[in-house]
């Protein structure tokens, strides 16, 4: 069961770190920037250069969802690295919450935010027309991806400096979402774009 007191404490921990604070709200800024680009810049490019970027909106949406997941995954990874330094996980193991409860509360923090941000991104940008169940599925997948990124950072890095380097490498995986543009079908991370295409 998710303990909302722990989530409140997680927010306090995030706000004490400038990097995590920026990463927590950066998805909203990214959504706003791309909305402005879609409304003002993309029509200008289509008129001026006769290049229709709307053909690539599916890839744009997939990239934004992966970017949001990656950022929130870094946040949860950094929080768990802080806990590792302070031996918080070991202390939680002897409390009624337990180690499994600690992990559920930690990982739910990023996955819930990622779920909410993903829904906001899809509705605010409004560049794809997909059923509501597809939006829910994509948002859930984004939340799961953020958990995976966070756990990989936690398991592969000893401190935040190494964690940031590790995170950059992990988030490079997002480029595989655009492999369909190069007709390289052997790339594995293509499900987000294919879900959009199958929903049309």
Task: Give the residues covered by each predicted segment.
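N-terminal Sec/SRP start-transfer signal
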Residues: 1-21
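Hydrophobic alpha-helical transmembrane segments
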Residues: 21-24, 60-61, 104, 108, ...
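Hydrophobic alpha-helical interface/terminus motif in multipass membrane transporters
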Residues: 80, 89-92, 124, 153, ...
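Terminal transmembrane helical anchor/hairpin motif
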Residues: 40-41, 46-53, 179-200
